[in-house]
Regions:
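Charged, amphipathic alpha-helical segments and their flanking helix caps
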Residues: 1-19, 39-127
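Short acidic low-complexity segments
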Residues: 19-29
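A short, hydrophobic beta-strand-centered structural micro-motif
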Residues: 29-40
Length: 127
């Protein structure tokens, strides 16, 4: 299991519709809310197998802001800031932490969007 699989499993467990990089409606019909994740990596200069990245989750709905806040609350509870959710992976260990959120303007009155950031720390090693 790697970080992509780990995140996908967590989002599925939370009941949050999630795909990586772009949303492709499984049946061709766009349903709200949906969440798209994108990774940014931080260059690390260590030899201990440590890697750091940020997952940018963009949640979109045609519902209310309360719906987005509810999704954020689920994510915040699963990946608490400062404590994180830790697990072993096939290649080492991972810790995922809630790192903030903000509304994203859409230009459409009924379309609401929020970005939720998760910090990810990985330690690669021989398992």
């Amino acid at each position: 299991m790697d970080k992509l699989q780990f995140i996908n499993e967590q989002m599925t467990d939370l009941g949050i519709p999630y795909q990586l990089n772009e949303w492709n409606a499984p049946d061709g019909i766009l349903k709200y809310p949906y969440t798209v994740g994108e990774f940014t990596e931080v260059a690390t200069m260590t030899e201990d197998g440590y890697e750091e990245s940020t997952l940018l989750l963009t949640v979109t709905t045609r519902g209310s802001w309360f719906e987005l806040e509810g999704i954020k609350a689920k994510i915040k509870k699963r990946f608490p800031a400062g404590i994180g959710l830790c697990a072993e992976t096939d290649s080492g260990s991972i810790a995922v932490f809630y790192a903030g959120s903000f509304p994203v303007p859409t230009g459409e009155a009924d379309l609401k969007r929020m970005q939720i950031n998760l910090d990810i720390k990985e330690w690669k090693g021989l398992n």
